[in-house]
A protein has these predicted regions:
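Extracytoplasmic metal-acquisition and chelation regions
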Residues: 1-221
Length: 221
């Protein structure tokens, strides 16, 4: 049983995750969904303030990307001393659906990190921690995921996977509203599936198959 109202907060580091959780929660009042990062803040260069650490210390769930832009998460979880938190990485949720970043000749590399050649296995399960056990991986997930494109939410199929798995994780914390969470998630993923079908229909009917963009990062998915 959660001790106080602050612990009923679900924090998200990206608007996409915030939107998914908000759709799952619907009109239920057990949890409050909030953004950790303020409007206009660039997540690629964001570092949590002492106030942000306090927010993490008092939340019930943290949904973050799990890539090179938020390697600070592991340290923040340790500093927060929140033993009951459920920390969920989006890259872990999509698992093998995550795409490798591709270095193209002539494209400026904005995020440079050294990578080894070992294979990395991503389980399609949330980084859910048992009661009393915080995420103390010391950035292991983030370090392993550095060469994957973080913008997983740009794929509607990924959005469906994330929504369904987040709904399962939230249901684990609040079984009383489980039916409503599942119903809300199904309604939302139905809309995503319809939109994905519309995109596929448009693509199949297209006479031009080449798109010229100015930045590869947002469009890999």
């Amino acid at each position: 049983q959660m001790a106080d109202k602050d612990e009923n907060v679900i924090l998200c580091t990206t608007f996409a995750a915030y939107d998914w959780v908000r759709e799952i929660l619907g009109d239920t009042d057990t949890f409050t969904c909030r953004m950790l990062v303020d409007n206009g803040v660039d997540l690629h260069s964001y570092q949590p303030s002492a106030q942000d650490i306090m927010k993490i210390a008092n939340c019930r769930m943290l949904v973050y990307v799990g890539g090179e832009s938020d390697t600070w998460v592991s340290d923040a979880l340790v500093e927060s001393r929140n033993e009951n938190i459920v920390a969920i990485s989006l890259l872990d949720l999509v698992g093998n659906r995550a795409l490798n970043e591709v270095e193209l000749e002539g494209v400026e590399e904005h995020h440079h990190h050294d990578h080894d050649d070992e294979d990395h296995d991503h389980e399609a399960e949330p980084a859910d921690h048992a009661e009393g056990e915080a995420d103390n991986t010391d950035g292991q997930n983030a370090a392993e995921d550095d060469h994957y494109d973080e913008h997983v939410w740009l794929s509607l199929k990924n959005a469906i996977v994330c929504t369904e798995t987040l709904a399962d994780a939230i249901t684990e914390l609040d079984s009383d509203n489980a039916k409503q969470y599942v119903t809300n998630a199904k309604t939302y993923t139905g809309k995503l599936e319809a939109l994905d079908d519309d995109y596929q229909t448009m693509r199949d009917a297209a006479t031009q198959t080449t798109i010229l963009v100015g930045d590869r990062f947002p469009f890999l998915y």
